[in-house]
A protein has these predicted regions:
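Acidic, proline/glycine-rich low-complexity IDRs
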Residues: 1-19, 149-247
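Extended, low-hydrophobicity segments enriched in charged/polar residues
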Residues: 4-182
């Protein structure tokens, strides 16, 4: 756990909330990934390739509005550097009408036995003590990503260079829009014609930025670490659509 620059008060509150079970996920996400149906809706699993994590320090954000920001912080927990598969659970809400429910990265082929809210060390934990069910990351452009700290550095350089070449441009309309459409042609399952996901390879690198439709669009989305029986982190999960019967 990376606790550098985090106050003792925050760490004490984090540990207290953990002991009270207030950092736990409301559902077993692994069971949902194994299921074919949720609340009467068919579920499908959509592989999205792989992402490389050179440092193992990661976080989730909206790639269009936050990835190039200068104040991004990673989660306090870290994983072993490596290349890992990423996949999304898709719900068919109506005939040929799909929405993405969960996205996960798999670090180990072990079964999760518990989940913990992913945090960065600067959040107001009083929200959880006061009854809020989770703290999440904001989405303002309808997309989400999970990336490594090193990927952020590479993406910022790509973004800076692109805008130098296109000072009056819009990077989504003038660059990513076409990539989403091409991906929908190449992988039409569970996508609208304009595209609902890409696994973007940053030019001149081996680093990928998955950009994934965030459920019903803009909002605040929680991220959870999954731990196996040995206490090792085996997955990280973004929840786009609530999987809890209590909501």
């Amino acid at each position: 756990m990376n606790t550098q620059d985090i106050s003792k008060e925050w760490i004490d509150t984090f540990n207290h909330l953990g002991s009270e079970g207030k950092l736990k996920a409301p559902v077993d996400y692994h069971a949902i990934f194994e299921a074919d149906e949720l609340f009467g809706k068919k579920l499908y699993t959509l592989p999205m390739g792989y992402i490389t994590l050179p440092t193992g320090r990661i976080f989730a954000c909206d790639p269009l509005t936050h990835l190039a920001a200068v104040d991004n912080k990673t989660y306090i927990r870290t994983v072993n550097p490596g290349t890992y598969p990423i996949e999304t659970k898709v719900a068919e809400l109506d005939t040929d009408y799909y929405r993405y429910v969960l996205t996960r990265v798999l670090f180990k082929n072990t079964k999760p036995v518990q989940y913990e809210l992913a945090l960065k060390g600067h959040e107001d934990l009083n929200e959880l003590e006061d009854g809020e069910s989770y703290i999440g990351f904001p989405v303002d452009a309808g997309l989400a990503t999970l990336v490594d700290e090193a990927t952020v550095t590479a993406y910022r350089e790509f973004d800076r260079h692109w805008y130098e070449q296109h000072p009056d441009g819009n990077i989504y309309d003038d660059y990513f829009d076409e990539l989403f459409k091409l991906n929908a042609i190449a992988y039409p399952k569970f996508q609208r014609p304009g595209g609902d996901w890409i696994n973007f390879k940053i030019p001149n690198t081996d680093l990928y930025v998955p950009m994934i439709q965030s459920g019903f669009g803009d909002g605040l989305y929680p991220v959870y670490w999954a731990f196996d029986e040995a206490g090792d982190i085996c997955q990280i999960i973004i929840e786009f659509i609530s999987c809890s019967s209590n909501e």
